[in-house]
Amino acid sequence: MAILAGKKVIAVGDRDGVPGPAIAECAKSAGAEVVFATTECFVUTAAGTMDLQNQARIKELAEELGGENIVVLLGAAEPDTASLAAETVTLGDPTFAGPLAGVSLGLKVYHILEPEIKAEIDPAVYEEQAAMMEMVLDVDALAAEVSKMRKEGSKY
C-alpha cells in the first residue's frame, strides 16, 4: 500500500540536510499533495526544538485536514534532530516550548531518505533532489530514529 499517493504532505526540511522544497518535489512525484513545506535550521533554534510557528501550522493542518490524511516528511541531517522532530509531530513537543507541548497528533512521519519512501518517488526526481544527501548523511541511523518514533507515537 502506498504511503504517499493521495496523502497531504507536510515537508519539514533541514538547512543542513534535505531542504523543504526538495522534499516537496519528491512527494509530488509520488502522487502526494504538499500542503506545507519549510526548511528549518535545527541548530539555530533554541533548545533544538522545532520552530514554534511551524508547530502551530502543523497543528492547524492536522485539525483542518484530519491526521489520518497527513504524512510528515523530514529532511533532518542528524538522527537526534530527526527523532526530536518525529516526536514533536507524534507524541508532542518534548521541550514543552511550543503549541504542540502536551499535544499528541499521532501523525505518520518518515524521513525522506527512508527506503520505503524512496521507493515511491520518481527515480529521476529523487536523484535530482535528495540522492546527494544519501552519500553524506547516516541514512540507517536517521531511519532507525524516525521509525522508532513512528512505531511509538503514530496513530495512523
UniProtKB/Swiss-Prot annotation:
Q: Does the keyword Oxidoreductase apply?
A: yes
Question: Which keywords appear in this protein's UniProt record, sorted alphabetically?
Answer: Oxidoreductase, Selenocysteine
Q: Return the GO cellular component terms, semicolon-separated.
A: glycine reductase complex
Reported EC number(s) for this entry are: 1.21.4.2, 1.21.4.3, 1.21.4.4
A GO term for molecular function: sarcosine reductase activity
Q: Which residues form the active site?
A: 44
Name the Pfam families on file: GRDA
Q: Which reaction does it catalyse?
A: acetyl phosphate + [thioredoxin]-disulfide + NH4(+) + H2O = [thioredoxin]-dithiol + glycine + phosphate + H(+); acetyl phosphate + methylamine + [thioredoxin]-disulfide + H2O = sarcosine + [thioredoxin]-dithiol + phosphate + H(+); acetyl phosphate + trimethylamine + [thioredoxin]-disulfide + H2O = glycine betaine + [thioredoxin]-dithiol + phosphate + H(+)
Top-level taxon of origin: Bacteria
> What does the subunit comment say?
Monomer. Component of the glycine, sarcosine and betaine reductase complexes, together with components B and C.
Its annotated function is as follows: In the first step of glycine, betaine and sarcosine reductases, the substrate is bound to component PB via a Schiff base intermediate. Then the PB-activated substrate is nucleophilically attacked by the selenol anion of component PA to transform it to a carboxymethylated selenoether and the respective amine. By action of component PC, acetyl phosphate is formed, leaving component PA in its oxidized state. Finally component PA becomes reduced by the thioredoxin system to start a new catalytic cycle of reductive deamination.
Q: Which family does it belong to?
A: Belongs to the GrdA family.
What is the name listed in the Swiss-Prot or TrEMBL entry for this protein? Glycine/sarcosine/betaine reductase complex component A
